C-alpha cells in the first residue's frame, strides 16, 4: 500500500506555534527516511489549533532538506489568491525540487469568515468561481495557452522549466470530486474532516465523471485519514485521549491547541461528552502499528482508494514520530525504502 503524510503543524499546549513549524521540518525528514511517498502541508489561518498558514513556504524549506519524498500542499485554498501568483509560487518550487512537487487545490477557507475576508475581500465571489481559477492556474503552471480572448492570455508564469508540478483536487464533499474529475486531476478525499461520511459517494462520483487528461489518462484516488499507532493498545488509547478532548472542542466550533493525555485525564467529563467521545472512538483508527495498517488497507479497499495519506497527531512529538514509524513498518514501507536506496 502506498502511504503519504498530511501535516497540519498542530499546536500543542505548553509549546509555541513556532515550535510546531520546526517540528514539521523534522518530521518531514523522518517520514522520508521511513519510505512515505508524499509529505503534504495544510493551510489554516488565524487558528490557535494549527500553525500551518503558508504551505508553499514550508514546502520550500522541506525541499531543501529532503531528496526523494514528494512535497505538496493540501491544500492551497484557491479563493484567497490570484491564480497567476499561485502558478508562479509552484513553478519556483518545481525549480527547487524538480519532479517532486504536488499542488493540492482546495476551495474551503481554512479559516473563519472574517479572516477569509481579510485575506481576500472578494473571497466569497472567488469561491463560486473556483473552476475558472483552476482552469487558469493549470494553464499557467503547465505552460499551455489560456482560453481564447482571455485578458491575460499573453502572460506567462515564470520560471519555466522542463517539469511541472502535479496538480491534485482536494475536498470533503461531492463538489471537490466533480472539479477534480472535470479537469482530469488526481483526487484526495479528506476523510479526517467528515469521519468518512460521504467518502465512498464522492470517490464513486469522481470515477464516474472523470475526464481523462494528458497527464492523467485514468482517475487516481487518495484518502486522507486520521490515525494513531503506538507500541501497545493501552498506550495508543492513552495518546488518543488528547485527540478525543480536542475533537469535543472542535465540534463546538472552538479550535484550541491539542491537550496532553494528562490534561485529558484531568478533564471533568460530562456524561454527554463521554458519550460523544465513545462515538468518535468507534470511528477512529487507533492501535498498534499492525492494527492501524490493517484498518488503512481495509479502508482503501472499501472506498476504492489507490493510496492513503495519514494525519497522525499526538501531544508528544516523539509519540507522533513513533506513530508514523510503526505504521510504515507494519505496511512494509521500510522494505521499499531499502529498495529505493539500493537503486
PLM region spans:
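Acidic (Asp/Glu)-rich catalytic clusters
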Residues: 32, 59-68, 94-100, 179-182, ...
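Active-site mouth loops of central-metabolism enzymes
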Residues: 7-22, 76-84, 161-171, 230, ...
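Flexible, glycine-rich active-site loops centered on histidine and acidic residues
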Residues: 2-19, 79-145, 195
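An alpha-helical appendage that flanks or caps ligand/catalytic pockets
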Residues: 123-156, 197-305, 335-343
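A conserved active-site cap/scaffold subdomain adjacent to cofactor or substrate pockets
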Residues: 173-197, 202
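Conserved, mostly hydrophobic/aromatic
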Residues: 3, 31, 35, 43, ...
Amino acid at each position: 500500500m502506498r502511504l503519504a503524510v498530511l501535516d497540519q503543524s498542530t499546536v500543542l499546549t505548553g509549546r509555541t506555534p513556532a515550535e510546531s513549524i520546526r517540528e514539521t521540518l523534522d518530521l518531514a525528514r523522518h517520514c522520508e527516511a521511513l519510505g512515505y511517498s508524499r509529505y503534504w502541508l495544510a493551510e489554516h489561518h488565524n487558528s490557535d489549533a494549527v500553525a500551518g498558514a503558508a504551505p508553499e513556504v514550508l514546502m520550500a524549506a522541506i525541499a531543501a532538506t529532503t531528496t526523494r519524498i514528494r512535497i505538496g500542499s493540501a491544500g492551497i485554498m484557491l479563493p484567497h489568491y490570484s491564480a497567476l501568483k499561485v502558478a508562479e509560487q509552484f513553478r519556483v518550487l518545481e525549480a527547487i525540487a524538480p519532479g517532486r512537487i504536488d499542488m493540492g487545490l482546495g476551495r474551503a477557507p481554512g479559516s473563519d469568515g472574517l479572516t477569509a475576508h481579510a485575506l481576500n475581500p472578494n473571497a466569497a465571489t472567488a469561491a463560486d468561481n473556483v473552476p475558472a481559477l483552476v482552469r487558469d492556474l493549470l494553464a499557467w503552471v503547465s505552460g499551455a495557452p489560456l482560453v481564447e480572448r482571455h485578458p491575460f492570455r499573453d502572460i506567462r508564469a515564470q520560471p519555466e522549466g522542463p517539469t511541472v508540478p502535479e496538480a491534485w483536487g482536494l475536498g470533503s464533499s461531492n463538489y471537490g470530486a466533480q472539479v477534480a474529475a472535470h479537469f482530469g486531476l488526481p483526487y484526495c478525499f479528506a476523510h479526517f474532516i467528515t469521519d468518512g461520511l460521504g467518502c465512498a459517494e464522492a470517490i464513486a462520483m469522481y470515477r464516474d465523471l472523470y475526464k481523462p487528461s494528458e497527464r492523467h489518462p485514468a482517475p487516481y484516488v487518495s484518502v486522507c485519514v486520521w490515525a494513531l499507532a503506538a507500541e501497545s493498545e493501552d498506550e495508543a488509547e492513552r495518546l488518543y485521549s488528547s485527540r478525543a478532548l480536542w475533537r469535543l472542542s472542535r465540534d463546538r466550533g472552538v479550535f484550541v491547541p491539542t491537550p496532553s493525555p494528562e490534561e485529558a485525564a484531568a478533564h471533568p467529563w460530562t456524561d454527554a461528552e463521554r458519550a460523544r467521545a465513545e462515538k468518535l472512538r468507534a470511528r477512529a483508527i487507533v492501535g498498534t502499528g499492525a492494527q492501524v495498517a490493517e484498518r488503512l488497507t481495509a479502508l482503501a479497499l472499501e472506498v476504492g482508494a489507490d493510496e492513503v495519506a495519514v494525519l497522525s497527531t499526538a501531544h508528544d512529538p516523539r509519540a507522533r514520530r513513533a506513530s508514523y514509524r510503526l505504521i510504515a513498518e507494519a505496511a512494509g514501507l521500510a522494505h521499499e525504502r531499502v529498495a529505493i536506496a539500493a537503486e
